Amino acid sequence: YVFEVIQNSNFAQEVHESFMDLAVGTGILAVNEGDAVHPIQFNAIPLPHVVLDIGHDDNIDHVFRVRHARCDQLMLMYPKAQLSETLKKKCQKEPDAKIEILEVVCKDYTVKNDDGSALYAIVMESKEVIFQEQYKGVGSNPYVCFRWAKCAGEVYGRGPLVNALSAIKTTNLTIELVLENAQM
């Protein structure tokens, strides 16, 4: 059943986009609950939209993501959100107003011998937590973060693009010098 659900989801498209980011060194895939038709929704997250942090065991345990949404989308993104009266009034008055949200997923280190993560959604303007959710069990982080290669203590991976960057710069400089000499 699991493979059927994944096969009928948008996994193939989104993992392809994540693999394109993996060329730089790190790919990120968000796994979200869907609906009855699509039980699982995947979303490739571009690397510039997140900040990753490692825990004491060198695993990526913390994901910080800035999102922008219209007021009328808040309850669709976070159905169990607790909005303050000020935010409710703002959303009623200006449903198209953009809200900046910091989404934080962090590993729960308080529970021994079990994995757990917590998701927090914070409105940046007022610094209020509008949504929080606990995830329990192995693989409970809703973000799948994968790296091409890394050295000890590094958060982000080193992909083939990073390794080829010096060769690309040298090639560009060589072409530039050839073109300059051709003009003489």
Residue ranges of each PLM-predicted region?
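Extended alpha-helical, oligomerization-prone segments that build pores/tubes and scaffolds
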Residues: 1-184
